[in-house]
Amino acid sequence: MNKRTTSSCLALACLTLAWTAHAGPAPDTLAPSATGITTLRCGTLIDGRSATSRRDVAIRIEDGRIVAVGAFAPGAAGTVIDRSQDTCLPGLIDAHAHVLIKTDDYQVDHLRRSSGYKALRGLNVVQEMLWSGWTTVRILGDADVAYAHFDVRTAIQEGLFSGPRLTGAGHYFSITGGGGDLNFIAPEHQVAGDGLVVDGVDAVRKAVREEIKHGSDWIKVLASGAMMSAGNDPNRAHFSPDELAAIVDEATRLGVPVAAHAHSAAGIKASILAGARTIEHGTFMDDESIRLLKEKGVYLVPTLYVGDYYLNEQPGSEAQAKMNELTRKYRAQHIAAVGKAIKAGVNVTVGTDYVGFPVKQGVRELGLLVEAGMTPMQAIQAATRVNAELLGWQDHVGTVEAGKLADIIAVPGDPLHDLSMLEKVSFVMLGGREVLRP
């Protein structure tokens, strides 16, 4: 075993240990919780863990946490909230969003908007996400030279504004000429890319430290080219094995996991072997990629809907002509590969890749996972329990069980028979507090 292999193995061995000491705010500090006793009556409950739903259920909540789940009976304690005509389920978790990105020409918009403006716009987006049922959101880098979404997170933590629990990465790391660089700018212009452009082992280590210093509790690396940015090929691996190993090693030592954007099979495999916890997209994954995902317990966040959105609803977008061409060409292949991963038992989860489409439509990601081979129940669990496990927050969110934070939503009808019901969220509770839309 050579020195590089030994280092990689040690990094992988450390990953589980580091996870228990995950840096960043605890989930229950990310939004204020209610005080007192509340009973929530649900006509039907999908709890995020059980294989079937239950009828006429009472959820007892004390000081923001669930203390009991059982059959409803008259005389329930505390304030009673009646959702007996609705289906209740755990608050949804979006494992992949870019809340500061609002336009299809985001690489140009990155240059025209200030970080302060992006913070205000991002606050609006995350509030819309909360009202639409997303009670936890992992932000995987944003087109901002500063850390505007962490300012949004702090404002929510301090109770200045309502919003979901936020976690994630400040920026996405890109090689020079990669998916986070501005590859349409003449060389004499020195302009900051929408990503964090960084090259070399020492530079990536320093970048990891700076990201964590400024609030990142995930590190995001573009391990391949991208579908949406100009001048790079998503089917090419980016960052050398040494750079990837250094990124994961540095992040792991500091208790922070790594999310790897990887479309190409080579980028996927290199990221898994380096020790990434999640693979984002996975468009060109092959059988060996799927085997490694399963063997290493790495989560796959395929982000299927964003391509459909641009192809079907913005087919004439000049800014996303590349995305539309690639989606048209490779959509079926991507869906089939995700189906293979599901069948192989890979932890496939839900990430909307939000980049400015109507927030309510993000739940259509679940329908595409059903198209790939999941049942509706599996898709709902992917957006709740499995995503909580991805975050390492399974003791706090993701299921409706005693001991968990009372992050609960309700929808009319039965989403197990019609997933579009998830676009009609009628009730949101965050930490036992009912969230009211202004």
Which ranges hold each PLM region?
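Acidic, glycine-enriched loop/beta-strand segments at the rims
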Residues: 27-31, 45-58, 71-72, 375-380, ...
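Active-site gating loops and adjacent loop-to-helix segments of metal-dependent hydrolytic enzymes
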Residues: 101-118, 176-193, 227-241, 296-331
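Histidine/acidic-residue-rich catalytic or RNA/ligand-binding cores of hydrolases
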Residues: 104-107, 149, 229-231, 268-274, ...
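Divalent metal-dependent hydrolysis catalytic cores, especially in the metallo-beta-lactamase
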Residues: 123-148, 162-172, 216-229, 257, ...
